């Protein structure tokens, strides 16, 4: 369940900042709210919802990347046009998706112990978008690169509200 750390480290490396995945993961705040910190254990079972092992959303990841000197910004409701502008400028984008860019499903609402409600989905995952053409996006998913059709990507990305980390 450390895809967010893997994506963050790969993204940082693209901009010349060398980070350790284990160190990044260890420095993420812990919380039962994925909008505030990492929920559960990175060694937990996949496909669970909070308060079980789940992962973390964009804001804590961007904040930690910023701590390491990157001008990272978490965005929500980000448009595909804006994502393409980032890619065209040579800036890969970390995105939150459903599974391995599966067609989206209805998300769930989870209320954390502090009363904050977060949108969550089973098999929450992060990947890096590195390119696009008229038909597909190019994805870096750990050590694997692949492409998905734009409609399939948009369906998956919309599940968690078009959440991303961009270079600002």
Summary of predicted features, one role per range:
Residues 1-83, 88-91, 162-168:
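Cysteine-nucleophile protease catalytic domains, especially the papain-like/related folds used
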Residues 7, 76-79, 97-101, 131-133, ...:
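A mature extracytoplasmic/lumenal domain signature
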Residues 19, 27-31, 35, 40, ...:
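Generic preference for flexible, low-structure residues
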Residues 103, 108-121, 126-168:
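Noncatalytic regulatory segments and standalone regulatory/sensor domains
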């Amino acid at each position: 369940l450390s895809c967010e750390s893997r994506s963050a480290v790969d993204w940082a490396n693209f901009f010349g900042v060398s980070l350790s995945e284990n160190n990044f993961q260890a420095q993420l705040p812990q919380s039962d709210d994925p909008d505030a910190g990492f929920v559960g254990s990175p060694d937990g079972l996949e496909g669970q919802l909070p308060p079980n092992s789940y992962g973390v959303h964009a804001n804590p990841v961007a904040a930690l990347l910023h701590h390491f000197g990157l001008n990272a910004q978490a965005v929500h409701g980000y448009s595909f046009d804006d994502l393409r502008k980032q890619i065209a400028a040579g800036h890969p984008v970390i995105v939150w998706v459903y599974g391995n860019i599966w067609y989206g499903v209805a998300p769930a609402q989870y209320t954390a112990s502090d009363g904050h409600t977060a949108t969550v989905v089973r098999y929450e995952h992060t990947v890096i978008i590195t390119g696009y053409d008229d038909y597909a996006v190019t994805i870096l998913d750990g050590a694997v690169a692949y492409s998905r059709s734009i409609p399939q990507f948009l369906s998956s990305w919309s599940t968690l509200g078009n959440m991303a980390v961009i270079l600002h």
